[in-house]
Amino acid sequence: MTTLTITRPDDWHVHLRDGEVLADTVRDISRYNGRALIMPNTVPPVTTTEMALAYRDRIQAHNQTEQFSPLMSLYLTDNTTADEVRKAKASGAVVAAKLYPAGATTNSDSGVTDVKKIYPVLQAMQEVGMLLLVHGEVTTHDVDIFDREKTFLDNVLAPIVQDFPDLKIVLEHITTSDAVVFVKNANENVAATITAHHLLYNRNHMLVGGIKPHFYCLPILKRNTHQLALISAATSGNKKFFLGTDSAPHAKGAKESACGCAGSYTAHAALELYAEVFEQAGKLENLEAFASHNGPDFYGLPRNQDTITLVKDAWPVPASMPFGGDIVVPIRAGENMEWKVK
């Protein structure tokens, strides 16, 4: 197959950052996506409806397309109120709230210290129909970084699913076979996003032959057996799994340092990267469901009405890309991509 036409895709998990870099990140995310769900872990975090609406306006100021719309999310803290959730839902612009366990990832220090503290908020979310997005890792120092996801599933997420059976939950950027099994076995209100880089790479790519800092992300890349489980889930056509890139840019110097930041930038070529995975798995026919159907269906939103076309046409990824007054090194920097969006 050398061409593939699919319903216009959406990205259900992306980091655009804030300030002058929006000119670059919005350009990349809006190139062919219909919608993107914008993560709220900016500095300061997006904790109120007013902040979410203001952030959306800053994003839209750089949107040069007609088809792209940013969808906003709230950052949950120990102090988030049920009233704020209702206000966010009523705004029509905020579609979800994000649970970051405190300290789990970039700019998560303001996150939730104990899930029980936000149970009234989760109850309100269940009542008004606002989705809960979850960064599924525990942050206690006694848990190995490669076991954080499994421990979170057992100790944190399972009780939430049991206590709030009607709350729609997205387990974001899953990285383990354990998460695949959890989502498959959970009720119909639990789904998951999967990134391109967790499908393409495992921890050997990051660590063998020298440390590759641009593969360092959170949740961290796992062993090959988990990677294969993710590929199987993503390409299966199962409606519980859909596209969320977790594209997370950092300036080159912040990645290539003695204490490098976590995050991989894929927004420049996300759909093309996914297409490679699906082609290698012999499941290109399921890319449309993963990229364009399952996400809006789970969110209760209409599918996009127009289409985009991928062609088998090699093109080089630049060694770096503009990032405000700095540069970002994208995934596949200096290499060729096999697919291209026309």
Curated annotation (Swiss-Prot):
Positions with a binding annotation for Zn(2+) 2: K98, H135, H173
EC number annotated for this UniProt entry: 3.5.2.3
Record: residues binding Zn(2+) 1: H13, H15, K98, D246
Binding site for substrate: H15, L16, R17, N41, H135, L218, H250, A262
Catalytic residues, chain numbering: D246
InterPro entries: Amidohydro-rel, DHOdimr, Dihydroorotase_CS, Metal_Hydrolase
GO MF term set: dihydroorotase activity; zinc ion binding
Cofactor note: Binds 2 Zn(2+) ions per subunit.
Domain of life of the source: Bacteria
Cross-referenced PROSITE patterns: DIHYDROOROTASE_1 (PS00482), DIHYDROOROTASE_2 (PS00483)
HAMAP family: PyrC_classII
PANTHER family (UniProt xref): DIHYDROOROTASE (PTHR43137:SF1)
Biological function: Catalyzes the reversible cyclization of carbamoyl aspartate to dihydroorotate.
Protein name (Swiss-Prot/TrEMBL): Dihydroorotase
Provenance organism: Vibrio vulnificus (strain YJ016)
Classification lineage: Bacteria, Pseudomonadati, Pseudomonadota, Gammaproteobacteria, Vibrionales
Gene: pyrC
